[in-house]
């Protein structure tokens, strides 16, 4: 049976009336099942690795980690005295720090040694005591700094390090990374110069403690261990006799705080948003049933959407936050159109079922076109290289379908069931006939002016937005400025000379088909070039005061240099030397000498890294892997310390390192890849840009193809799509004017604009077409469209805008931005659908008539 004829509508209405109760029961059961799947509420994954696209570097890193320890992950701890203005380097504070460090080590030892290293002032002092104190005492055994220094200092002076680049580099790194900018070590120098007389206590307002966690752990394990460390240190810091306070930050902890606090905040915002929607629907329809039915239906649709994805085993990313407002926006639109048509049909029949079927019959083509086109537009996100964006597109498409089913079937069944049992409900929805007259008259007089204004605004938007919008991906953007983790991060940025310490890993492996790296002499030359380049790169940490620049990184090159400088006979045994800060070969060098030097270091348990307290063997194992027979180099890893506070700096660093790896591959005949958290962030940024451009273009293209296929008319299809594209450009221009950049949520605004824009445009076009087919002239058809569809769109768009505006109450910057930009997007989509599209449709009619 086809809808449209009175007989078929009456038969379907009879079936629908009988099925109303089963439909409501089935919807309720489906909602309960979906709701149970959402209990407890799912977490929104914010782990960096979940956003990153798969690259060749991932495969290379997997090969390397088969024979080498995985790169570590860092926890940053900002340590300040509990007493304001106190000295964090007082011996008592250092003793507590040593005790707390030991507690962390005990926790690590009880959990498979998940801590691989510490950068910690107390640890450095303990290493010095282990190496130089004849009695092998610990910090706790001393009462003053003078006693401690007496045990490790002989006849040294502060000036003794001059000329010792390694010592200066270590000290400079420690000062810039670990100690507050106000660090004062003059008392130590004066004490040394005065024959160990006086108080040598150095001073600083704060110190940094970096804990490096094993890279072998999964993200969940790493988070669990990070939380254990945070809980342990916070408990110890709140003890009555504690002299220190700890502020702890890491990407894992930031993700956890987002899941625990920000998403809870968002749930309340969404509930408030729904409350606002209820008030606006009540104002529009002035009927409890007209408010309750769509609200229940859309709540069910949201539960079906999220519940279905959970049952499929899909992990939600933070992007899925945006699904709810999109589904609500589209669902409200479907419901308002259907309910207004239902009101009109109800005046002509006593059967609520027949009235609902007739309302759907009138709107079925517009609704079907809208749902199919919008769903395909969202599915275009499958083109994205970022896995979460693929899932986001699928979730949105499912949400559109759920909203359609709930709005047409469930809401209709509720109306039929309620009116069947409780009697006829009074419907007095808002009417806008006078506004329709004014809008039509405006179009008749000013169509050309409107189109010219739109063209000018679009051109201005493009000009303003070109080069103005940056892409950002900072996990901390999802947290409010008043949250502890943000306060700690800001304090760290202000306190230390090296801000936002991060690392970039360079992985070097043999060419495909080769089992080892060959040409050790040439390899050393290439590594020397890299060492020189790193020394002059803007964002690479380079300690000051050395005779030759020594960038802060670890790898085979600085490893060999440090080993040779620490023991000249080591270099002689392997025909290697350090010449003016550069590692080179000496007489007698042959292929394999570098590998033999590495083999020796892999068995050396002496301290090889004073800052972290690692042995030569531990340090070497992290950076070099030999072939199974131990005679050649197989894999190399270089871990470079860099600073990057924002996405712009991240992109610049990634570009510099990419150029460097290209030169390295050409020079050494090897394969080189980049990895590390900073590169991960850059890959996400690049993926977001690509996704935004490709998905927008593809969404519009797919939408056009679907419309042409369904309508078999290219003219109207182009007319429908044009305002949607214009709305997208206007939104981008508005973002540029407001200073809002692309981030992981606002990047989705084009999907929202396309989804709602197509829906609005199809409703306007379809109603205009129906009115024309019924014999109305161009302007009468437009007036009728404004009176019916236009009024419905004003209600639905106004409701959606107010719902999004509630997000401005969020303390979270990116959610506020998303709420504002979404509201602007809906407003632009509405303006273009009601002011521009009617003029284009009228122009098309005149063109079709040969005028």
Predicted regions and their residues:
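Short helical (or helix-break) motifs at transmembrane helix termini and adjacent helical loops
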Residues: 326-347, 367-369, 373-374, 404-411, ...
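Hydrophobic, glycine/alanine-rich multi-pass transmembrane helices and their short helix-loop junctions
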Residues: 280, 312, 368-418, 704-708, ...
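Interfacial segments of transmembrane alpha-helices in multi-pass membrane proteins
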Residues: 259-316, 367, 383-387, 694-740, ...
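Pore- and gate-forming transmembrane helices of large, multi-pass membrane proteins
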Residues: 257, 261-268, 295, 334, ...
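Feature of extramembrane
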Residues: 2-274, 278-289, 421-697, 846-851
